[in-house]
Amino acid sequence: MTAMVVPAAFSAFAQDSSQTKATELEKVTVTGSLIPQSEIETATPITTITAEDIKARGFNSVADVLQKSSFATGGVQGAQSSNTFTQGAKTVSLFGLPPGYVKYLIDGRPMSNYPALYDGSDTFNNISGIPIDLVDRIEILPGGQSSLYGSDAIAGVINVILKKKMDGAVFSIRGGGYSEGGGSNFRATFADGWTSADGRTSVIGGVQYEEKDPIWAYQRDLTKQYNTQGYTPQLVGRAFLVNSYRSSYKFLDPANCGNVSGLFGGTMNLQRRVGFGDEYYCGSPNVAGYRTLSNSLKSGQAYVHGTFDVNDNVQLYGDVLYSHEQTKYHSGAELIWWGSSADFGYYYDPNVGDLVNLQRVFAPEEMGINGIKDTMSRDKSESVRVTFGAQGTLGQSNWDYDAGVTYTQYKLEERNFVRFKDPIDQFFLDRVMGPQQEGVDPIFNSYPVYTPDYAAFYQPISQQDFASFTGHATNKSKTSDGMIRLQATNATLFSLPGGDAGLAIVGEYGKQKWDYDPDANLLNGSIWGLSSVAGGGDRDRYALTSELRMPVFEPLTITLAGRYDAFKASGRTIDKPTYSIALEYRPFESLLLRGKYGTAFRAPTLSDLYQSKSGYYSSVIDYYQCAQRGFLPGNTEKCPSTYSSHQFKGTQSGNLDLKPINADVWSVGLVWSPVDRMALTVDYLNWDISDEVTQQSADGLSLQDYRCRAGIDDINSALCAATEAQVTRNQAGQITGIYTPKINVSNQKLEALTASFRYGYDFGRWGDLSTVTSYTGNIRHKYTRYAGDTAVDLLNNPYWSTDPKRKADTALTWEIGNFSTTWFASWFDKTPNYASTIDVKGYAAERAGKLPSYITHNASVTYKAFEGMELSLMVNNVFNKMPPLDASYSGGTRWAYNELNFDAFGRAYYLEMRYSFGK
């Protein structure tokens, strides 16, 4: 459910009357500023989600908190997204911007990047390995924040702050599961703190262990078989199929699927698709259910934080956070298959008199003694984060300092289930295909001739045979980031009519590394139907940051911030200065008007720079050849298809010449707190993002190649020389290859409105009632991929985006005596149905439309049984809400809902016991 927006300002507004004036409040440092100050709510909107909020609203992980935040309007790939590159990781998209546009911090210092790439191309952070029970609070800053936090802080900054103080030892144990089955989980946490008798030494430590079973698609009615509520009758997957070149299906099983009827739990039988040749094949409706919706998990984290006061002016500090995670998942039995077309192409069978292919899916009964579970893939990760340093005051001055070193490392081992190319082909050659016959086909005079034993094809295989051509391929990858950071701060630099001006100066030096080393078999072509791409590199980085906060007079405060970042890689330096100007105006005590303008950026990631070359196949208009035949650019509709849709082999890779992604960002808003325990915030945010990284256009290169060859552009120019190097032609003048590296070319324009409201009232003996509501609405979001393209309206073009425009949530908490209960509701706006997302016509396409808005509810109750003991019951998705019916999916769909927006987990129950020792 959506993480509740809790205005940090409220903690200041809710002080009792003796503390209402800012000048009487203790100065603290909050995310969004480097300078300690009394006013927690500043020109930068900040949202705080406390440990109490996390528990009361039923959130199970940091990823759960952030993905359900009202800011997170963008859908992201995850455990439900079968056959993606990072199925074992979790991330978030703020305002529908890419996941890599968020800066993640732990205790104010950057997190290490995940070693694998989101969607196979982009660097991002995995937020699944943070121990939720050891989190003190999470702070979210929407909008560009690069002038303080550097690269990546375009969509916002998320700072996870771990516990630093404890009154005594705490032990908690939690267990639960889902009413529909699967997902049973267990979590135990122990934390304790110690302070020396003289108060100079303080240590806090904690450990957390968690286990969770997977949720299988066969455990949910919606996903256990192929779609039964589509616009066509159910189309069962083709587990055993002979496919003809000319007449589609050929059914050649003399036993009419009888020999394979025991597969997939005895559900394999004769199936029919009208209009497809012979129309018959062997299939099971339950093939679709053999995949995971939610990963299994075994994880453990350990955390230690300590301080030692050397004297009144020097404090040493250090902390260590270690995480180990193992997730298992399955992309689907339907994806574990073999087909003759992959390595043989069509073959000619003289007994059939046609060109045909074989295709068959392997069943759980063939896979091993544990069935489908024996073919799961596994991700094992290990991350460590170490920080140590010193902080204090420089002599008797007003200057505070903080000098620290942080090192993070993230190791990932992806163990993927694979089929080995030569053994699996040889197995079917020996068992089914038989020896190649003399001659070639009489139709095209090019395809080989085989006379397969089709009765042998329509047979189960033994688990031993299956094991002979399957196994695992292991990819190993690692990221690391070392940083030295020096900060000097003076909160009373000089006096102004509104108060003391403050200044902070920060210097940073760091070294970043990334290495992705796929299994050798994935690189040399030994794996059937699967490949990978290697990459790796390192760079040094430098940064200098300053912030000046000036209370010009009592109602008005101006804050200036500037930062310079430089990255040195492969002898090249990429640098970027950023700045921001922020205004806070308080016409009276209960109202804050605020505004901020600045710049933000994202440096080219190490994967952008160093991802190795990989191949792909596509088609392109050969503008030069079309022009030779009288069809100039813009008039190629009648150009022969050989040239107007010319097949070529493309090559893509990283690019050392990439520049930073740039953004101009600004916001205006207000915070209003007319009475105690009431606060309203409203903020408008605006982004203008340019130079985004995308793959270079093959169409654009073909067009430029024509311009150079036609003499429109100087053939001897650097532009034409570069184009000639990227577009390869054979002796006949036909395009054979195009090199399309990553380039800076795209841009986005985004406007959003965020709001939150909080109110609480003490009813005396009837208890205390409080409510919090948050809202995010994207007003405008346009994307232009290549220069000259028409901007795409991402809010109204479902072919490009399925994200909801608006998202909101509300929580109602009642505390009375020893009881506390919370009701939490999460809502998001209408989203496109499936038909509108697969056709360039969008909502004008056949069967296109919108799905209704979607709301779910969580409830929790906590009882203080006795001093130190708390018992809690939490129910998530109280009404067991499933994704809305989308009848625009066909009957052949494995799951008939958008997994980026919805899940089919259903209702979950959790029981928790928490005991605080010494109370």
Cite the ranges covered by each PLM segment.
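C-terminal beta-barrel architecture of Gram-negative outer-membrane proteins
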Residues: 616, 767-864, 879-880
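C-terminal beta-signal and adjacent terminal beta-strands/loops
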Residues: 679, 690, 779-782, 826-837, ...
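N-terminal Sec signal peptide and the immediately downstream disordered periplasmic leader
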Residues: 1-69, 189, 193-195, 312, ...
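Surface-exposed, low-complexity loop segments enriched in small/polar and acidic residues
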Residues: 119, 221-230, 259-297, 303, ...
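Short loop/turn motifs that connect adjacent beta-strands in outer-membrane beta-barrel proteins
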Residues: 165-168, 197-200, 311-314, 393-401, ...
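Short acidic/polar hinge/loop motifs at secondary-structure boundaries
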Residues: 109-142
